Structure formats: C-alpha cells, structure tokens
Swiss-Prot record:
Protein name: Riboflavin synthase
Subunit text: Homotrimer. Can interact with 6,7-dimethyl-8-ribityllumazine synthase, forming a lumazine synthase/riboflavin synthase complex, also designated as 'heavy riboflavin synthase complex', which consists of a trimer of riboflavin synthase enclosed within an icosahedral structure composed of 60 subunits of 6,7-dimethyl-8-ribityllumazine synthase.
Function: Catalyzes the dismutation of two molecules of 6,7-dimethyl-8-ribityllumazine, resulting in the formation of riboflavin and 5-amino-6-(D-ribitylamino)uracil.
Originating organism: Bacillus subtilis (strain 168)
Keywords: Repeat, Riboflavin biosynthesis, Transferase
InterPro entries: ATP_synth_asu-like_sf (IPR023366), Lumazine-bd (IPR001783), Lumazine-bd_dom (IPR026017), Riboflavin_synthase-like_b-brl (IPR017938)
Activity vs pH: Optimum pH is 7.4.
Length: 215
C-alpha cells in the first residue's frame, strides 16, 4: 500500500528485456536507506518487488502483463521515474490509498499554466473515467492528485510548482503517456452498485418471465 506522495525521483540505469518481460535497475538514494530484498517500491505508480540492490541502486522484475498495461515501454536508459516506498504502519498518511496496481494509461493533451498552478488534461479510455468523481482522487505516475475536471474521456488535474519540481512532471510534454490508478474506493463503490443493479434487473426479468408463463 502506498500514499501517492513521491519520496524522490530515480534514474533508469539499465533495462534488460526477456521476451515481453523486463528487469529494471534504478539509481537513487533516499529510498535505499532501509531497503530489503522483497520490499515493494512504487515506480511511476507501479508496485514492483526489489530483487537486488546496492548502496546506490535497486533492481525489480516486471511481468509481461504489467509491461503491457503501463507506460514502462516508453522508458529508456536515463529516464527519470517517481519512487515511493510502501507505507509504514506508523507513518503519516498524506495522500490517499494507492495500491500500485495500474488500471491503464492516459495521454497528456493539454498543459496550461495559470497563476501558481499548472493544469494537465489527460485523455483516457472511458472505462477508467466511469469510476471517478469531481474533487475525487486519482493517481498519475504514482502521484496522488485531485480531479478538477471530468468528461467521458478526459480528466483535468492541477499541480503546484513544488509537486512539479519534486516529480517527473517537470519533464512531461503534450503527448506524454502516464500511468493511471483510479481511486480504489470509487472502484469498489462502482462495482458494488453495478452488481446491485444487475441483480435487480435479473430478478425483475425472472419474475416477469414466470408471470407470463402462468407461474
């Protein structure tokens, strides 16, 4: 479990592909202070497991399904990535509940600076936006953010200069792809209500069918 508060940015040191899977080695410093084999680290919002580490870098393995569902294929040696360690039970909770299980990707279609904030439009599949609400939470490349605009296929977010400077958003341009994790509470609520409506419809159809057939 993560919070969406980025601890530092790291640099891709190497990418080794094996078929559709890959191993990433990432150079960093702060998050290695108490790292152990098997620890979970969110890399651009993707929960990955540490398989090896030294004093200034760590390695994670990435399954084919994860590669396919995320923007990892867009990374190259030298790319910057957002990093966050799994939340400690006694730590502060500054963002929102983030699982590190990416739901899909989005494309940045607008970047506009207004006063002390920068607004980004993120175009994504409508299957993602249906679980979202205005002023609700969304995770973008591992960063916990608030939704300021919402249509069927576009989400608008806003970042202050501090967040931009402390994350890889400083390198984003129009056309950049980002990882999206929808708020898990919203997903559970949508699933619950959707199933409830399905059951209600099925029950109504069953009663009507029986009545029409003399039962």
């Amino acid at each position: 479990m993560f919070t969406g508060i980025i601890e530092e940015t790291g640099t891709i040191e190497s990418m080794k592909k094996a078929g559709h899977a890959m191993a990433l080695t990432i150079k960093c410093s702060k998050i290695l202070e108490d790292v152990h084999l098997g620890d979970s680290i969110a890399v651009n919002g993707i929960c990955l497991t540490v398989t090896d580490f030294t004093k200034n870098q760590f390695t994670v393995d990435v399954m084919p399904e994860t590669v396919k569902a995320t923007s990892l294929n867009d990374l190259t040696k030298g790319s910057k990535v957002n990093l966050e360690r799994a939340m400690a039970a006694n730590g502060r909770f500054g963002g929102h509940f983030v699982s590190g299980h990416v739901d899909g990707t989005a494309e940045i279609t607008r970047i506009e600076e207004k006063s002390n904030a920068v607004y980004y439009d993120l175009k994504m599949d409508p299957s993602l936006t249906k679980t979202l609400v205005l002023k609700g939470s969304i995770t973008v490349d591992g960063v916990s953010l608030t939704i300021f605009g919402l249509t069927e296929d576009t989400v608008t977010i806003s970042l202050i200069p501090h967040t931009i400077s402390e994350t890889i958003f400083s390198e984003k341009t129009i056309g950049s792809k980002v990882n999206i994790e929808c708020d898990m509470i919203g997903k559970y609520m949508y699933r619950f209500l959707h199933k409830a409506n399905e059951n209600k419809t099925q029950q109504t159809i069953t009663k009507a069918f029986l009545s029409e057939n003399g039962f």
